[in-house]
UniProtKB/Swiss-Prot annotation:
UniProt keywords, alphabetically: Antiport, Calcium, Calcium transport, Cell membrane, Glycoprotein, Ion transport, Membrane, Potassium, Potassium transport, Repeat, Sodium, Sodium transport, Symport, Transmembrane, Transmembrane helix, Transport
Family the UniProt entry places it in: Belongs to the Ca(2+):cation antiporter (CaCA) (TC 2.A.19) family. SLC24A subfamily.
UniProt-recorded Gene Ontology molecular function terms: calcium channel activity; calcium, potassium:sodium antiporter activity; symporter activity
Chain's role: Calcium, potassium:sodium antiporter that transports 1 Ca(2+) and 1 K(+) in exchange for 4 Na(+). Required for learming and memory by regulating neuronal Ca(2+), which is essential for the development of synaptic plasticity.
One of the record's GO cellular component terms: photoreceptor inner segment
Protein name: Sodium/potassium/calcium exchanger 2
Native organism: Gallus gallus
Principal subcellular localization: membrane
Topology relative to the membrane: Multi-pass membrane protein
């Protein structure tokens, strides 16, 4: 890999310039990097949208409270002239306007609501409510954001690698591993937030977080992928059809179970069964996909075969190009739902410290090799694309054998790999280069978490900010990416779960304190701030995937990752609660969460229609449309939760 000495010019190049100054030539597919300023702008935009929604909620709450307070003061003035008696109080209530009696009634309801809002087994805060309202709440906000980062690091650097080892030990197929263990690794914060909401805070914060995270993944993530992609990406229908079909069924079940405000144990078991049905389908996903495509595209395959047979030598290059452009689509279409949980997320610390687009820099080291070509070679991007690469290679081979003779197309694939190597390299040199590339990949991939001091001021500042999180994890958890620590994967697995539970508890607790200070419920905090915060790592890695041209992976993973949340993140805590409490039902009554789930279902349909309207392309218009839908969802959900507007369907 070409290296450049860090100078003032290279630092300026890294921050500002699109073209290199000192001869470090970038690959033609690598134009811009996801610089830190873009990620900061992304986070600011998410916080701004959520804050705007919360401000609207707070405004309506303040207006209602001021009206009630004014009526209460006015009623007190009427009886201030003489000593209040029980008769005076009864006469006052009888002669008042309909709004006046709510002064005492509202006080009682407000006290009950305060007790309801403040309930939960949280420790006593260091700051009183008045101190938090005078500015101390900013510390809780900073701590909450810090917990978002902590959850991302512990999941990506320790939990997901330990799950990878477990899948290898159990010899689980790649599709099933992606739908189970890797999905659990990516959705662990939402799952533990739901557990805390059921057993500790006794609120619907988990439901709000999962529903809000689902909408965030579908609308905001897809919108960001459409805006940040280097080119207009064409999408294939299979992954979207597969995941959306399961997701729609799961949402319909959830809506039906929500109708009576109670979740019975068998309803939780039904949702878990739906998840196992999805896992079973993923077990045979390759066979089902190939069978469906064979039935639907039989005529197209025959045309491609006859066309190739008619003109073999003049169209050989064109056929190779078609194969190169088709293979990535099949790889994306057939990939498991949790792509960036296994491919990208276990390098989040490197994303924060060293580079925000690691695969882009690695692409530049392969000279004339294209990204899609490297994806077809065994050994390239071995660890970072461990699960994805196996699935992609398997699907490419199935595609080749289905279209024509497997051997003929395999030879073409091999010829393409030789053709894209520099012509000046002979066979031995080419093998040497391939060997060096594999060594570089192994060194990069198998290298455990490094706490080495960075070389630039920006990286050093980020390093110091993240070190209080990384160092305790590095000390307490064995890094299974180190071959000597690989055998300690059970310690890493259970230790990561403990850290995730601890960080999730702090996140929900501080979110509760922030909501209590501002005057909003935990459900709204879950729908907005917590949902966005727990989904930021998925957002960043999905954008990176989209910038690599893998639009299908970004879309299918956005939808597929929500299946785990709906069918495991919600029903598992409910089922555990029912088992512990003699199978008693779980109360899920909430002002706006039911309509929020219905709204999520409607937004999912809008996403499908929008993608179809854009002719299955991820363009800028689709991105802005997704942003608009997400903004509408936030506003409507907050207004529903605060009863500013009434839910048309009463439960």
């Amino acid at each position: 890999m070409a290296l450049c000495k860090k100078t003032v010019g290279s630092v300026l190049e890294e921050w500002c310039l699109n073209e290199p100054l000192f001869g470090c030539k970038r690959h033609q597919n690598v134009r811009k990097k996801l610089r830190l300023i873009r990620i900061i702008g992304l986070l600011v935009s998410v916080v701004a949208i959520s804050t705007f929604s919360l401000s609207i909620s707070a405004f309506f709450k303040m207006e209602t409270h001021s009206t009630v307070l004014a009526s209460s003061l006015e009623s007190q003035k009427l009886v201030h002239g003489h000593q209040r008696t029980l008769l005076d109080f009864m006469e006052q209530n009888e002669g008042s306007t309909p709004d006046s009696p709510t002064s005492m009634k509202h006080e009682a309801e407000h006290d009950n609501a305060t007790e309801e809002h403040s309930k939960g087994e949280y420790p006593e805060d260091l700051f009183s409510l008045e101190e938090r309202r005078k500015g101390a709440v900013i510390l809780h906000v900073i701590g909450m954001i810090y917990m978002f980062i902590a959850l991302a690091i512990v999941c990506d650097e320790f939990f997901v690698p330990s799950l990878t080892v477990i899948t290898e030990k159990l010899s689980i197929s790649d599709d099933v591993a992606g739908a189970t263990f890797m999905a659990a690794g990516g959705s662990a914060p939402e799952l533990f937030t739901s557990l805390i909401g059921v057993f500790i805070s006794h609120s619907n914060v988990g439901i709000g977080t999962i529903v809000g995270s689902a909408v965030f993944n579908i609308l905001f993530v897809i919108g960001m992928c459409a805006l940040f992609s280097r080119e207009i990406l064409n999408l294939t229908w299979w992954p979207l059809f597969r995941d959306v079909s399961f997701y729609i069924v799961d949402l319909i079940l959830l809506i039906i179970f929500f109708l009576d405000n109670l979740i019975m144990w068998w309803e939780s078991l039904t949702l878990l069964t739906a998840y196992f049905c999805y896992v079973t389908f993923m077990k045979f996903n390759v066979q089902v996909e190939e069978w469906v495509k064979k039935v639907l595209n039989r005529n197209k395959v025959e045309k491609a075969t006859t066309g190739d047979a008619e003109g073999k030598s003049p169209t050989a290059g064109d056929k190779d190009d078609q194969t190169l452009t088709t293979k990535p689509r099949l790889q994306r279409g057939g990939s498991s739902a949790s792509l960036h949980n296994s491919l990208m997320r276990n390098s989040i610390f490197q994303l924060m410290i060293h580079t925000l687009d690691p695969l882009a820099e690695e692409l530049g080291s392969y000279g004339n090799l294209k990204y899609y070509d490297t994806m077809t070679e065994e050994g390239k991007f071995k660890e970072r694309a461990s699960i994805l690469h196996k699935i992609a290679k398997k699907k490419c081979q199935v595609e080749d054998s289905e279209r024509q003779n497997g051997a003929a197309n395999h030879e073409k694939g091999a010829k393409v790999e030789v053709a894209v190597t520099p012509p000046s390299d002979s066979g031995p040199v080419q093998n040497g280069i391939a060997h060096n590339v594999d060594e570089e990949n192994e060194e990069d991939e198998d290298q455990p978490l490094s706490l080495a001091w960075p070389d630039t001021p920006r990286k050093q500042l980020t390093y110091l900010l993240v070190l209080p999180i990384v160092f305790p994890l590095w000390v307490s958890l064995p890094d299974v990416r180190n071959p000597r620590s690989r055998k300690f994967f059970p310690i890493t697995f259970f230790g990561s779960i403990s850290w995730i539970a601890f960080f999730s508890y702090l996140m929900v607790w501080w979110a509760h304190q922030v909501g209590e200070t501002i005057g909003i419920s935990e459900e709204i905090m879950g729908l907005t701030i917590l949902a966005a915060g727990t989904s930021i790592p998925d957002l960043i890695t999905s954008v990176i995937v989209a910038r690599k041209g893998l639009g299908d992976m970004a879309v299918s993973s956005s939808v597929g990752s929500n299946i785990f949340d709906i069918t495991v993140g919600l029903p598992l805590p409910w089922l555990l609660y029912a088992v512990i409490n003699n199978f008693s039902p779980v109360t899920v009554s909430s002002n706006g969460l039911f309509c929020a789930i219905v709204l999520l279902f409607i937004m999912l349909l809008f996403v499908i229609l929008s993608i179809a309207f854009c002719k299955w392309r991820m363009n800028k218009f689709l991105g802005f449309l997704m942003f608009g839908l997400y903004f509408v969802f936030l506003i409507v959900s907050v207004l529903l939760e605060d009863k500013v507007i009434q839910c048309p369907v009463s439960i």
